[in-house]
Amino acid sequence: MEPLMGMGVLALMGAAATIAGTTEDLESDVGSQSNPNSQVQLAPQMMYPHRIYNKAISGEPPSNALICAIGGTVASVLMTANLSVIFAIAIGALVASAVHGTYCITAYMGRTASQKRFRQPIYLDILRSHTPVMMGYAFITTFCILVVSYIMVAVLAHPFPLTLLAFIWGITVGAIGSSTGDVHYGAEREFQNVEFGSGLNAANSGNIVRKAESGLRNGIDNSWFCAKFGGPVTGLAFGMTVFLSGWVTAVFNPAISLTMGWLSVAAGVILVLLLIIWNRKIEVAARKAFGPYKEEEEVAA
């Protein structure tokens, strides 16, 4: 493949991955399927009932791996039957989103019903309004992951089958969403009533923000907030992962010669080192900008 064509293919994959990462994070924010879900689950036990959709089917990586693998399996079967690629991928994503919606409903009903002793109600309006939103986000995520996987198989001649690639990318996008976007949801949304940078005192466990800008807060309110930063950052992280992982071999194609293969390895190592240094500089700059915690200042005084 020509280098220019290869870069175009990588750009398309990066764009699809960016969308997938964004929708994956926002889906987890609507249903609170993320690391901060522990506080959503704990809140009724601490006598803080709420209207936040509490599903947490599993961790985000296995959950997204499941729906992407289901979508990839259905799409592969349909393409084997000579169905159009676009229709096969769309139908695969639709089936995956339906399965995901089923898990959402059973998880919400089961987890909330188990908290009856803590007087946590099951809100049927929350179930009806939030589940279609999560299914829509899951459809977009699965569709984009299948697009990336199909391009790798059909255009880049990757040796792995479509379903396995979709499974791997599903784990990846779930892991990135769990480590990137969840910080915004947990620290900046669930505990907006706590001073920034102060950490979570044990006395505040479960005391999440339950009142919204208007009325009581729900999962869609959280998704609206996280769409401003957490979702796009997750999409950017996943898009960069997909694009940069293929960029080094597109520029230094190992198929040309052994030297180019080693150059691609060196370029990858240099790229990782640059990202580590950049991340460290951002962290140091943030700490200098916000300063030390007040408790540390008082102890020093």
UniProtKB/Swiss-Prot annotation:
The chain crosses the membrane at residues 85-105, 130-150, 151-171, 232-252, 258-278. It is a multi-pass membrane protein. It catalyses: 5-methyl-5,6,7,8-tetrahydromethanopterin + coenzyme M + 2 Na(+)(in) = 5,6,7,8-tetrahydromethanopterin + methyl-coenzyme M + 2 Na(+)(out). It comes from Methanococcoides burtonii (strain DSM 6242 / NBRC 107633 / OCM 468 / ACE-M). Part of a complex that catalyzes the formation of methyl-coenzyme M and tetrahydromethanopterin from coenzyme M and methyl-tetrahydromethanopterin. This is an energy-conserving, sodium-ion translocating step. The keyword Ubl conjugation does not apply. The complex is composed of 8 subunits; MtrA, MtrB, MtrC, MtrD, MtrE, MtrF, MtrG and MtrH. GO terms for cellular component: cytoplasm; plasma membrane; vesicle membrane. Belongs to the MtrE family. InterPro entries: MeTrfase_E. This is Tetrahydromethanopterin S-methyltransferase subunit E. It holds the Pfam family MtrE. One of its GO terms (biological process) is one-carbon metabolic process. It is found in: Cell membrane. GO terms for molecular function: tetrahydromethanopterin S-methyltransferase activity. Its EC number is 7.2.1.4. Keywords: Cell membrane, Membrane, Methyltransferase, One-carbon metabolism, Transferase, Translocase, Transmembrane, Transmembrane helix.
